[in-house]
């Protein structure tokens, strides 16, 4: 090979390396999903979302109205609108449902019977609400680290989820602040459901 040809070859290789390193452009944007997060006061909604956002637990204050957090994951960003769970707030939840693409429902698995009954009623209402009934649901049985915590199977039976949510996209998972791997895995499953719903909408 002549010196000229060798020089051209080296220059072309340099060009390819330059393109690979410097000119490949920004990575594709992660999809964003708008979610609503509901549950009774004390269920742990704020603490779970703050932990996922790597916020200091010292700054966690129970939500009285609503707050919005952008929760980042490797393959998506979840814009979560958390609604306060007090008695006088829950009757206004439905005003904030519009535009939601998925639902996170947090319950205290170690709560009193009265609070568990109230949580069941609220979840039943959400699963049947016209603006939410077709959306993916992530149901988190929180506070599994407490001695009085009920198992997922007990929650599923008590909440009558099998007959009520038949045909819907839903996940019921145990969680606690002490097990972040399990919590992140639960949200990864929710993201999979959101992506599946997106793909179905495109095919239609």
Swiss-Prot record:
PANTHER family: ADP-RIBOSYLATION FACTOR-LIKE PROTEIN 15. GO terms for molecular function: GTP binding; GTPase activity. GTP binds at residues 39-46, 82-86, 142-145. Belongs to the small GTPase superfamily. Arf family. PROSITE patterns: ARF (PS51417). It comes from Pongo abelii. This is ADP-ribosylation factor-like protein 15. SMART domains: ARF, SAR. Keywords: GTP-binding, Nucleotide-binding.
């Amino acid at each position: 090979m002549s010196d000229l040809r060798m020089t051209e070859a080296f220059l072309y290789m340099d060009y390819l390396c330059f393109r690979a390193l410097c000119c490949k452009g920004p990575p594709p944007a992660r999809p964003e999903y708008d979610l609503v997060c509901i549950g009774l006061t004390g269920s742990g909604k704020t603490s779970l979302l703050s932990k996922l956002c790597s916020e200091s637990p010292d700054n966690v204050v129970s939500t009285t109205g609503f707050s919005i957090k952008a929760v980042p994951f490797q393959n998506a960003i979840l814009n979560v609108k958390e609604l306060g769970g007090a008695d006088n707030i829950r009757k206004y939840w439905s005003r904030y449902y519009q535009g939601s693409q998925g639902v996170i429902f947090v319950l205290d698995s170690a709560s009193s019977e009265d609070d568990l009954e109230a949580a069941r009623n609220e979840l039943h209402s959400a699963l049947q609400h016209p603006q939410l009934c077709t959306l993916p649901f992530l149901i988190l049985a929180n506070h599994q680290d407490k001695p009085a915590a009920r198992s997922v199977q007990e929650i599923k039976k008590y909440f009558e989820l099998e007959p009520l949510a038949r045909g819907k996209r839903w996940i019921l998972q145990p969680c606690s602040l002490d097990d972040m791997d399990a919590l992140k895995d639960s949200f990864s499953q929710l993201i999979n459901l959101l992506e599946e719903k997106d793909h179905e909408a495109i095919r239609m």
